[in-house]
Regions:
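Secreted/periplasmic carbohydrate-active enzymes, especially glycoside hydrolases
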Residues: 1-194, 206-207, 258, 282, ...
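Substrate-binding/catalytic cleft of secreted carbohydrate-active enzymes
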Residues: 191-487
Length: 636
């Protein structure tokens, strides 16, 4: 994780020849090279030279630190330098340069990044040189599905506000971003959504090397108005538009640049938001665009220029997130429904029918705005939304941990944990500080269980194309959001092991259904089992198995939980977390097994494996069982 080291900051003013390259745009999805040049004079020709492919196969240590970066550099064979004669009057050129059949496409499983160097020559001398990194990839959508190079993808993402407590600013070096993304990949993520900001080039480059889909966002959280409205701010909106163009020009070649959002939770003119989106889309159509993240929350619309929709609901009661704050009520299924493994959002996204009560009646409503409340106008007669573009759920999760006060000592940089100190003082005033570790552990177990319910519901939804967590790690800005399974330094808090988290957040997740987690001994249940699967290789000779396991409670276990330990933690585990017998599988014993053969897995997406019939074991007293589903195949 980026550390607070003193580094020299270099600021340069670079003079260039008047025959200079203004920018390079590589349209690699269709294997074309487009070069945009600053207007110049008196040059004869320039040469594009494809130099190398970068392949990123890397192993991460326990916390992703101190390792070498084992990139394998490959040079494409039989691709000579190519000379193009150019008129001095040409300022925009489109040149074709085929890479040949040996060139590989870029995606999360084969993140192959190419480097292009372009030089302007005159009389054998180099007047100007530019280098660009790119990948062969094309993002598209069809109805409710997202595709990369015609292969369906599902976004397993997280919000990121670029908060770095030790420095107060985002790192600009590649290695720091490789650690950030590499750690998140270990937790099954393949997507980052940046909240009202655009990360630096090093972030896009690291994401390209590691196969992360990045969504940048205009730096705005507010209302957009049309010209003529009394609230219209021409300078503000022109600034946002130019910032978007600059981001696209600077980073658009990098293959990780997946999406572009117009801002966070915008209100105001939908027509003007759509216009701004259209201008950016016309400027650079290599990415997918969305009007914003959770715009017009209670009265959303899918706009004509939307390539995908990011939000939390399509009307007051058509919710596709598991939990909500009271200011955004009604609450979600995690908060209101019986615990079980049965929920999905398909009917909420594409309902069989619409009732008249769902449309808006207009007027003024209160919304959350930053850390405060604001009133906004709602238009009358808003039509019910049936999306025709992919849907991504916005800022899901937000399950709080009680603070871990031992974390305070980690804040050795510019950001001071005054909020954590205040929380500690409050607990001490109430005589509860001695129980702080217990509160931390208990709240963590509850948060992990809630995240499991929420993510499995998202993966169980055929009509959903991705989710964006808030957050995989704590967010120490804009108040306090201790909602991550990792703290603000990307260190696991210990509530759930990385391997257990990946059981419900990865590119291959088993999704058995259970109507309830509370059953009677002897009951017969049927579980339909589905599989979210995106790995490039299929599965053959697939066998599904379900096992009932009785968890025996060890004597004195609760007392054992109270004792703190100073032992070294396991990899990625918070040092203050004491694992007890009840937290492990040590007391499990097999009591019943049910298995069945399944069809080979040859595709991607949400697949149905079949149904397993099970009988709940008889028991004299209340007992805690684990029902463990597993999938085996010849090539898993």
């Amino acid at each position: 994780y980026p550390s607070r080291k003193e580094k020299d900051v270099e600021i340069r003013l670079q003079l260039s020849h008047d025959s200079a390259l203004y920018g390079i745009r590589v349209s690699a999805g269709c294997r074309l090279t487009k070069l945009r040049m600053k207007e110049g004079r008196d040059f004869e020709h320039f040469e594009p030279l494809y130099t190398q492919a970068v392949e990123t196969r890397r192993e991460w240590t326990a916390q992703g630190k101190g390792q070498d970066l084992p990139y394998r550099i490959e040079t494409l064979e039989n691709l000579p330098e190519k000379i193009y004669e150019v008129s001095a009057l040409d300022t925009r050129l489109t040149l074709r340069y085929p890479l040949g059949e040996q060139a590989r496409e870029w995606d999360e499983y084969d993140p192959c990044v190419y480097e292009l160097t372009v030089r302007i020559l005159r009389g054998g001398s180099v007047l100007c040189e530019r280098t660009s990194h790119f990948g062969l990839r094309e993002f598209t959508h069809d109805e409710l599905k997202l595709y990369c190079n015609d292969k369906e993808i599902f976004l397993r993402g997280t919000h990121d506000g670029m908060s770095f407590p030790l420095t107060g600013y985002a790192p600009m070096d590649l290695d720091s971003w490789l650690r950030v993304y590499g750690t998140s990949r270990e937790y099954g993520l393949n997507h980052y959504r940046y909240h009202t900001c655009c990360p630096p080039k090093a972030a896009f480059l690291a994401a390209s090397y590691l196969g992360i889909y990045v969504q940048a966002e205009l730096a705005f959280w507010g209302s957009i108005y049309e010209a003529g409205d009394e609230n219209y701010d021409r300078e503000q909106q022109e600034f946002l538009l130019q910032e978007g163009i600059r981001a696209l020009d600077a980073f658009g070649d990098l293959p990780s640049y997946f999406g572009m959002s117009m801002g966070n939770e915008l209100w105001g003119s939908k027509a003007e938001i759509n216009r701004i989106m259209g201008v950016l889309k016309a400027h650079d159509d290599r990415h997918l665009y969305t009007q914003g993240s959770n715009n017009h929350q209670f009265v959303p619309s899918v706009l004509p220029n939307d390539d995908f929709f990011s939000g939390v609901r399509f009307s007051t009661h058509r919710l596709f997130r598991g939990s909500y704050a009271m200011c955004d009520a009604p609450l979600g299924f995690v908060q209101t429904q019986r615990p079980g493994a049965y929920w999905d959002y398909d009917e909420m996204i594409s309902p069989a029918r619409i009732t008249g009560s769902e449309s808006s009646k207009g007027g003024t409503i209160q919304i959350q705005y930053g850390t405060g409340i604001r009133e906004v106008e709602v238009g009358e007669g808003e039509a019910e939304v049936i999306p025709h573009v992919p849907v991504v759920s916005h800022e899901i999760g937000q399950y709080e941990f009680t603070p871990d006060f031992h974390e305070i000592e980690r804040y050795t940089g510019v950001l001071q944990p005054e909020n954590m100190k205040i929380f500690r003082e409050r607990m001490e005033e109430k005589g509860l500080l001695g129980y702080a570790d217990e509160y931390f552990r208990a709240s963590g177990k509850l948060a992990a269980a809630c995240y499991k319910l929420e993510l499995e519901a998202a993966l169980r939804s055929a009509n959903l194309s991705g989710f964006q967590l808030l957050d995989i790690k704590d967010f120490p800005g804009q108040g306090t959001a201790l909602v991550g399974i990792m703290n603000a330094f990307q260190i696991n808090k210990g509530a759930i092991a990385r391997t257990d988290w990946r059981m419900f957040c990865s590119d291959a997740v088993l999704l058995p259904t259970l109507d309830s987690f509370v059953m009677r001994g002897g009951d017969c249940i049927r579980s339909e089992v589905k599989l979210r699967y995106y790995r490039p290789e299929g599965l053959t000779n697939v066998r599904l198995q379900a096992v009932w396991l009785l968890k025996k409670q060890a004597a004195g276990d609760m007392e054992h939980r109270k004792r703190r330990t100073e032992r070294q933690p396991e990899e990625g585990q918070n040092a203050r977390w004491q694992k007890s017998a009840a937290d492990s599988d040590a007391g499990l014993c097999g009591t019943a097994v049910q298995a069945r053969d399944c069809a080979d897995v040859t595709g991607r997406g949400l697949l149905t494996l079949g149904t397993i019939a099970l009988k709940v074991p008889e028991c004299e007293n209340n007992a805690v069982y684990t029902l463990r589903f597993s999938l085996t195949s010849d090539n898993a």
